[in-house]
Regions:
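Short alpha-helical "patches" and their helix-cap loops
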Residues: 27-40, 79-80, 108, 167-177
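Short terminal or interdomain "cap/linker" segment that borders an active site or interface and mediates
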Residues: 2-15, 115-150, 163-208
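A generic signature of intrinsically disordered, low-complexity regions enriched in glycine/proline
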Residues: 31, 35, 95, 99, ...
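Short, mixed-charge aromatic SLiMs
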Residues: 38-46, 88-89, 176-186
């Protein structure tokens, strides 16, 4: 079995998820769930530091706990929970950006958002025209886990809804063990909308 590449998640995600869970379920219930977590991750879940970086394994474990304990293995409820966590998280990091943004504008910032909350594995590209965006994730070998695919679609839906107050149509186009392509359709305000392409990858050097 191939070794997974290094990947870390910023603590602000755990803080947002913890705050959201405590608001909905109360301290006692959340503390009970945390006590059922892997011993090595309990301190992360109990008192996450927003600026700290935590291993991908702790994030994957958190997703599993949310799905099994909080959502009771209900995919629709799991996505609703992730949307709530995402809204809290993006409002912490990108509040001013979202307040004045269109769906198209904020989706072009998805690669930047990725680098704000993740480091290590993975690249993100956005291809956009009119009222459609395709967000492609590559070199991130966690997409074989269906929870990561649900996480991604729910997060994109929440980001757009936060800035437009409308839910876009979000659909998985294709995925492999380390890639995922998602199509987002939304209302496009301007009549003319040029083609946009943004990426976490550095631009290619001009050949001589």
């Amino acid at each position: 079995m191939a070794e997974l590449p290094p990947s870390e998640v910023k603590g602000v995600w755990f803080v947002s998820a913890l705050d959201y869970a405590r608001e909905l379920h109360g301290d006692a219930q959340v503390d009970e769930w945390i006590q059922r977590a892997h011993l090595g991750y309990r301190d992360i879940y109990q008192s996450p530091i927003p600026s700290a970086w935590y291993p991908e394994a702790s994030f994957q474990e958190a997703l599993s706990m949310i799905y099994e304990l909080v959502a009771q293995e209900n995919a629709f409820l799991f996505e609703q929970i992730i949307e709530g966590c995402t809204e809290k998280g993006v409002n912490r990091l990108f509040k001013m950006l979202l307040r004045v943004s269109s769906a198209a504008f904020v989706l072009r910032r998805v690669p930047t958002m990725w680098r704000q909350i993740r480091r290590g594995a993975g690249h993100v590209e956005v291809l956009q025209q009119g009222g459609h965006s395709i967000v492609s994730y590559t070199e991130f070998p966690w997409f074989k886990d269906p929870l990561y695919r649900m996480l991604t679609t729910a997060s994109l839906r929440a980001v757009v809804r936060t800035c437009t107050q409308r839910a876009p149509r979000v659909e998985v186009m294709d995925f492999t063990h380390d890639s995922l392509s998602v199509h987002i359709a939304y209302r496009c305000e301007p009549e003319f909308s040029p083609l946009h392409h943004v990426s976490t990858r550095p631009p290619p050097r001009n050949s001589l």
